[in-house]
């Protein structure tokens, strides 16, 4: 199953820690807990979101650690997965000015993962296996794609199948005035 690499996750979470106002820019960025596959990341994202909604303008690792410490499940996950160090990595190693790049990469990988979950063959879109023969060329193309391009590729494949297997699909065209004279004549007494 395709996963998003930890460095990209660090850039995403660190970027919104430094600039939580990005969460309000819903025309450009749409993030939600389900975008993250690991439980720790979901808790961290939710904490950042809730701190921002509560009025925080810049969020530090200690803010998130304190916030999650109030939830026993989150606290246990933080302890088990070295969450405090992860938060510090997000704070220190992210570059908020590169957020847009990492966001696009993050969303593309999530889309491909979702397609894979639904049973689509994504091997011609993205390759996780560096030993695969076409790994480099596939991923080079992937870098140039956006989510719309990926979905259009899938739609094109489905349209090809539809053209091959769906028979007798035609559309009868007309206008709003077709049959109006007959209707008026039938209504006159």
Question: What are the roles of these predicted feature ranges?
Answer:
Residues 1-109:
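Noncatalytic partner-interaction/assembly domains of nucleic-acid and motor enzyme complexes
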Residues 48-50, 139-140, 166-169:
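Charged, low-complexity surface segments at secondary-structure and domain boundaries
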């Amino acid at each position: 199953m395709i996963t998003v690499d930890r460095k990209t996750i660090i850039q995403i979470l660190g970027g919104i820690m430094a600039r939580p106002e990005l969460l309000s820019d819903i025309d450009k960025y749409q993030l939600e807990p389900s975008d993250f596959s690991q439980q720790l990341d979901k808790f961290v994202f939710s904490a950042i979101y809730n701190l921002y909604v509560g009025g925080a303008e810049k969020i530090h690792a200690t803010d998130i650690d304190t916030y999650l410490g109030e939830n026993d499940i989150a606290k246990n996950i933080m302890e088990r997965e070295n969450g405090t160090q992860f938060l510090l990595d997000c704070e220190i190693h992210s570059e908020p000015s590169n957020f847009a790049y990492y966001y696009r990469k993050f969303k593309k990988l999530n889309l491909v993962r979702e397609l894979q979950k639904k049973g689509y063959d994504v091997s011609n879109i993205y390759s996780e296996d560096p030993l695969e023969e076409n790994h480099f060329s596939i991923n080079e193309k992937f870098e140039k794609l956006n989510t719309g391009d990926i979905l259009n590729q899938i739609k094109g494949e489905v349209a090809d199948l539809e053209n091959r297997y769906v028979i007798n699909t035609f559309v009868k065209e007309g206008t709003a005035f077709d049959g109006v004279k007959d209707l008026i004549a039938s209504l006159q007494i």
